[in-house]
Amino acid sequence: MRKTLVAVTVTFAWLLAGQLSWAQKSNYKEHAELAKALKGVKTSLEKGLAASETQGKPISGKFEVEDGKLQLSVYTMKGDKFSEVIVDHKTGKVAKTEAITGGDDLTAAKAQSEAMAKTKLSLRGATEKAVKENKEFRAVSAMPSLKDGHPVAEITLVKGEEFKTVSEKLD
């Protein structure tokens, strides 16, 4: 019985380590792909958040590579409705807006709006602060959440291929 328990524990630990290793490699690959796609892009996340304000209150924003193409996506909230605003990363202007009506996107938007409902500082303001405090870095994502009942934004920054995440208080 004891040998079986040890074998199961070792197998579980091995599987867990393998999953974590795969996740780290996947995350590294995504970061490398994003860093490469951002080379030469003049539009900042802050400008994208500002542009999206015409469609509602920005509740999250990020650069991402989707189908091999760079995209600047901002979730906004207007009343009780949510939208995904795609900002053209070449011009800094809104390219298209789509309603968020279900699935994981709606779940994420609701959680983000809950965090943003308790803020005194805008997501753009928090992002600008993070960039100002981290010279030579640019923001690639800003995601709000509640920590111990207080709203914070996790701002992911990049300089070349170096990524780091900082927390900014929103209250």
Residue ranges and their predicted role:
Residues R2-T9, W14-D171:
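Long, terminal "pre-/pro-" and other extracytoplasmic accessory regions
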